[in-house]
């Protein structure tokens, strides 16, 4: 039973699909995709449930969402294990993902109040009131890299605002989505408020193009996001929130603590096997002896990164990539850069055939005149040596993306200079660029998004403002407008 529609589990009526543990190549979940008719049923169920869900009021909705938080807390070990098996990420990392899902509840409640709450201003003859209303039925498209946390970051604020949801997870992580919906069901969510449709491209297209959805919240590749943006052209009445990738730069300038810099570089480039949209893809290090020493230490540290299966003991830093196909894609990306003149300082390689396990790579691309502006979504870091800080910033900005960027530097003036000139939605100083606060907005510019920042600002795209002028009774003004006689 792979589809959850109107509070009931159904088998899909499409074709057979399975989910593979990428560290072993073994199937861990099997199901049948949703057809366009089942997608239609899910949207109809969400539509039928929406007004009553909204009319429950915020406190009642929050109470049910809090019950979901309790279910997450009670089942966190089991959910973390499912995420680890299906994504290949190490157990320590998936435990932090479930922790982020739990923390999202309080953050979303606070954001709802701060970003989209109710505000009243008393006037001489009445009052001005600002309220917010839900859009209605929204589709949530989830990614595979954080299959619990990232869709959760759309679903929770959407529900708190009074929307109902049709959730289409990544076809690579269906088991995680199924486990999430079981917890929502146990939390007592009314029928139709969340509906799950599992499937591949055909299922996604049926949902994205459905005339009865009022919005779509997407986390995933820039390519798919741009297709959705084109599809929604001419539909100004629908809200579209796109959270996409990046070709993210990290610049190092004048750092005295080389060991700490190496640590932040590794955390920026190789965490989650490089499968975070905020991961550093390009590293800029000054020419000279200090830069040479930093690179030497970085090479040693990258070679020492432990890679292993999700359940390996001791636990590895890097687990598997999402699939063998993804692993082969990174090997091919490295070969492309080498053919253009890149020199591998640490060779990325597939660790075991038939799996998504790869070792991390570091490649010097300084001599490549036209560096491809691509998001290589894996553990491959491109190194560029520079002599001039302005030139490093110019190169860092030479991308159509604009998600995250960072500077490792002892001098605050250097950071202020960098901050004023860099083009990105997340800009960190002396911190890994994969680090982001849930109490802040999360999003980028350019090909990284469409100005609908998520995280704390997700509340903004989950509701629309309603401005009212109100009085308790009708009354005559002190004087009539010219030309009136009543």
From Swiss-Prot:
NAD(+) binds at residues 220-225. One of its GO terms (biological process) is arginine catabolic process to glutamate. Its EC number is 1.2.1.71. It catalyses: N-succinyl-L-glutamate 5-semialdehyde + NAD(+) + H2O = N-succinyl-L-glutamate + NADH + 2 H(+). CDD domains: ALDH_SGSD_AstD. The active site is at 243, 277. GO terms for molecular function: succinylglutamate-semialdehyde dehydrogenase activity. Keywords: Arginine metabolism, NAD, Oxidoreductase. Pathway: Amino-acid degradation; L-arginine degradation via AST pathway; L-glutamate and succinate from L-arginine: step 4/5. InterPro entries: Ald_DH/histidinol_DH (IPR016161), Ald_DH_C (IPR016163), Ald_DH_CS_CYS (IPR016160), Ald_DH_CS_GLU (IPR029510), Ald_DH_N (IPR016162), Aldehyde_DH_dom (IPR015590), SuccinylGlu_semiald_DH_AstD (IPR017649). Pfam families: Aldedh. Catalyzes the NAD-dependent reduction of succinylglutamate semialdehyde into succinylglutamate. Belongs to the aldehyde dehydrogenase family. AstD subfamily. This is N-succinylglutamate 5-semialdehyde dehydrogenase 2. It comes from Shewanella denitrificans (strain OS217 / ATCC BAA-1090 / DSM 15013). The gene is astD2.
């Amino acid at each position: 039973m792979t589809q959850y529609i109107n509070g009931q589990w159904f088998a899909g009526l499409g074709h057979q699909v399975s989910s593979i543990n990428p560290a072993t190549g073994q199937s861990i979940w099997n199901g049948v995709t949703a057809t366009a008719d089942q997608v239609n049923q899910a949207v109809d169920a969400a539509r039928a449930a929406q007004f009553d869900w909204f009319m429950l009021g915020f406190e009642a909705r929050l109470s049910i969402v809090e019950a979901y938080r309790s279910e997450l807390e009670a089942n966190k070990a089991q959910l973390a294990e499912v995420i680890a098996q299906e994504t290949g990420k190490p157990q320590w990392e998936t435990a932090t993902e479930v922790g982020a899902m739990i923390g999202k509840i309080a953050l979303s409640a606070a954001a709802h109040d701060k970003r989209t709450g109710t505000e009243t201003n008393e006037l001489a003859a009445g009052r001005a009131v600002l309220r917010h209303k839900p859009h209605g039925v929204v589709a949530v498209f989830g990614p595979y890299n954080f299959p619990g946390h990232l869709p959760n970051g759309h679903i929770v604020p959407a529900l708190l605002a009074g929307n109902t949801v049709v959730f289409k997870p990544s076809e690579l992580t269906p088991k995680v989505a199924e486990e999430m919906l079981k917890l929502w069901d146990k939390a007592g969510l009314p029928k139709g408020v969340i509906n799950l449709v599992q499937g591949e491209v055909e299922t996604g297209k049926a949902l994205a193009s459905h005339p009865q959805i009022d919005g779509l919240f997407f986390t995933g590749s820039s390519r798919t996001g741009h297709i959705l943006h084109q599809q929604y052209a001419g539909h100004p009445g629908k809200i579209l929130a796109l959270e996409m990738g990046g070709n993210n730069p990290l610049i190092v300038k004048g750092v005295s603590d080389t060991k700490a810099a190496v640590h932040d570089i590794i955390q920026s480039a190789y965490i989650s096997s490089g499968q975070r949209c905020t991961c550093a893809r390009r590293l800029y290090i000054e020419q000279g002896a200090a830069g040479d020493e930093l690179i030497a230490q970085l090479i040693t540290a990258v070679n020492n990164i432990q890679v292993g299966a999700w359940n390996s003991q001791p636990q590895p830093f890097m687990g598997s990539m999402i699939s063998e196909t993804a692993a082969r894609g990174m090997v091919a990306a490295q070969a492309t850069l080498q053919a253009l003149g890149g020199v591998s300082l640490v060779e990325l390689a597939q660790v075991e055939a038939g799996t998504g396990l790869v070792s991390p790579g570091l490649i010097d691309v300084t001599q490549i005149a036209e560096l491809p502006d691509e998001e290589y979504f894996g553990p491959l870091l491109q190194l560029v040596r520079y002599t001039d800080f302005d030139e490093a910033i110019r190169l860092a900005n030479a991308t159509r993306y604009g998600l995250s960027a960072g500077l490792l530097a002892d001098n605050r003036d250097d950071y202020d200079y960098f901050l004023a000139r860099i083009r990105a939605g997340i800009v960190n100083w002396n911190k890994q660029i994969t680090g982001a606060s849930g109490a802040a907005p999360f999003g980028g510019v350019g090909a990284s998004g469409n100005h609908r920042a998520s995280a704390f600002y997700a509340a903004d795209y989950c509701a629309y403002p309603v401005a009212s002028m109100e009085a308790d009774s009708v009354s005559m003004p002190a004087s009539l407008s010219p030309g009136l006689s009543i």
